[in-house]
Structure formats: structure tokens, C-alpha cells
Amino acid sequence: MKRLKKAALAVACAAVLCSVFSGCGGDKKDTAKAAPAEEKVLTVYTARSESLNNLVIPAFEKETGIKVNVIVAGTGPLVKRVASEKDNPQGDILWAADQTMLDSQKELFEKYVSPEDANMIDAAKNKTGYFSPAFADPTVFIVNKKLAGDMKIAGFDNLLNPALKGKIACGDPANSSSAFQVLMAMLYAKGKDGDPMSPEAWAYVDNFIKNVDGKFLNSSGAVHKGAADGEYTVGLTWEDPAATYVKNGADVEVVFPKEGAIFPGESVQIIKGAKHMENAKKFIDFMLSQKIQEAAGKTLTVRPLRKGVKLADYMTPQDTIALFKNYDEGWVAAHKKEVVAEWNKHLENSRQ
């Protein structure tokens, strides 16, 4: 009996010791502090259109319960803001620009490739790890059908038609991002063996400058408006405003050049050191999702970049558009200054 009492006492003492010291199994879980949950907010810097912001952001808030603080400004000011705040980031997402503009400033962004990236068209994959193309502003011609009549305007060769001399609206690639994309499309279309810097590519540019009559517009908006209003027969622009005219019943046609189009992806990226990292990842996943990509394709005039998305009837079907297979956005980003300098040289020579 005494032995049993001693054994019971030993067990009781051991139990007390276990409750005092952390050496017994299972206590580490109880004493470890749980990581604080990320607050359900997200700050988005966006240069996108009001219609696109209104499509994406309220839907994201509703689906996730995450409150989005929206800061709207132009692309340039937003990129400068991200750079100025790099030591103490105030934003989580930059929804502006594309790889061409941002590639030299990768250090301002976090690497993140969404699981949805696998569902995007090949030309819109996140190849760098930083920039997720969501929608595109492809290079197009907006043709005034009344002025064009029976004239064929299907590709870059047609733009050298003497009947179009002085009747082509185009911005200055040195001052307009959309005009720069038009220039790159020309160079890839007419370059020997697809080399955008070949003499053949720039010979085409010289002839184009002559047919434009050396007059390049200062406003990108004046390009598509000039064609729609009948001031010019054709304008070299981007799809969103051109498709808007078609949607609204204007007597214009959107033409994707037969040689190929450039699909600069309006990308979305996470700001380096974002305070709401997991929420930012959810935002990118949501933007690339079937739900949002298809909603944009059916109701807006921006081009979604997810495979198999249905489009409104005023949009050009994806399978009828030729894309440059050798277009290298990384190369363009690295050589933009060189291309613009060459453009300026050819433009200056045309005026002598």
C-alpha cells in the first residue's frame, strides 16, 4: 500500500512539473504567438481608365472583403511616386505602364507570378517574374470609312499610297507612348528578317514620314479623334478609343495591320515591401481570372489577355489578329532611347 501511495505521489509531482516547465510535449504550440492576420485593406495606384477601375475594384472588394484605397493619377507621376516611397512604401499595387516602361526599375517591385499566368495568351505571360500583363492596348489603324471609300488600308504598305499623303494622323514617337508602339510595329513589320533596327526598317520609316507630310500630332487623343471626325482618312492609334467609336456607332473601322500587331500588356505589379502582400497577390489573381477578363471583354473596349475569353461583337475576334512572333518586349525596353534617337535623326533629316 505504501508503495502505491509513493507511486501516485511521484506521478502527481511529475504532472505539476510538466505544467511549470516547457519541456513536456505540446506546450510549444500553446505558448507560441500566432502571426497577426493581415488587415483587410489594399492601396492601389492606378492609371487605368475609370471604366476599367469601376469594373475590377468593386468586384474585388465584394468577393474578398478587402477594402481598396484607390489613388488615380497618370502613369509617369505614379511611377515617380513609387520610386520616392521606396524606403517606406505607401502603396501595395501599381496598376499602370508595362514592361517597356518599368523594366529598368525592377528593383521597385516584388517578384510574383500568379497561378492564373498559365491561362494567359503566350504573348502576355509574365516572363520577368515582376510584371503581370492583364489587358492590352494593341496598335491599330482607325479608318474613316467614308473618306477611305474603296481604298485598301490593311497594312503598313498601304500607308505609303500617294492618295493618303497628308491624310494620315500619327503622334510623335518621341513624346507619345502609343505612337512609339506604332513605330515599333512598323520597324518589326518592315525590318529585314524581323530585325527592327535594320536599314530596310528605317527606309520604310523615311517613306512613311514623307507620306505623313512630316506633320506629327502632339496629342495622342487628336489622332483617333481626327480620323473619326473626318479630318484624316486614317489614324495610327491604340484599340481602346478606336473600338469605342465603333461601339458608339461611328462610321469608322478598326484595322489590325496584316503584318502583325503589338500587344503591349497593361501590367499590374506588386510594390516592393508592400504592407499588404497577401492581399496584393489576391488582387493580381483576381485581375487575371476568367470572371474579370471575360467581364471586360464583353462590356468594355480594352482587350483581355486570357485565353478563350469571349468578346463583344464590336471587338475584333482574337483569332483574326496576326501577332509578331519575334516581338521582344525586353529588347524594346532596353533599347527605347536608342530607337527614339534614331527616329529623331530620321525626322530631322526629312526636314532638311
PLM region spans:
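Short beta-strand->loop
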Residues: 110-118, 130-132, 157-160, 250-262, ...
